Amino acid sequence: MYINTFKYTPKDVSCQLCTEYVKKLGCTALRCPWLAERIEAGVVGYREAVLETVPHERRLFQRLNLLIKHYPGSLWSNEQHERRMQYQCAVQGYRRRRDTNAYYAAMYLLTSNDDIYRRTANCFCKDGIEFGYAVLKNTSPHNYALFMAARDLCDKTEAVTMADLAEPEVIDPKALRLIVNATLIARYGLAAFQIRARGAEYER
């Protein structure tokens, strides 16, 4: 069995090497065609990642700008969040068919705080996430939004809409950040944790 251990480096993904790069004009692409590879190399900032990934919607854009402005430099809510997800990954082990980007994105949401984790810990199994085992009675609006977003990512449903994300009364700021971060994980996998506060374009 061949195991691919190749990992992109900043040198591999230099914009000057891209076919969309013109010497006197710079990048001529409307959207970066190699964003996933650049994220893996750790040269993409949070602003670029979010704006390239989340669909543009005027009211939501205003909220996204605040997320970008106040990005703490990590996708994790805190150290406890990181430890909970790492623990759950260790408990579940590795299963190639199960461990998709969407699976990890949902796990990220369901381990984001202690209450939602206790309510959904029994949902994790060898085949994926069985959302029907969650204990949602008397859960907070914040955690309910995270739960529905996690289910959307895994089951490709749309319980949480773009209109919901644009409404602070429906999706609070902390929930919005977590859902946006989970969307990045669903698109780019665990490499999304390499996203920085500022991209390499600020360091030239």
Language model segments and positions:
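GHKL/Bergerat-fold ATPase module
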Residues: C154-E158
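Long, hydrophobic alpha/beta structural blocks
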Residues: N143-L146
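Extended, charge-biased low-complexity segments
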Residues: M1-N138, A159-R204
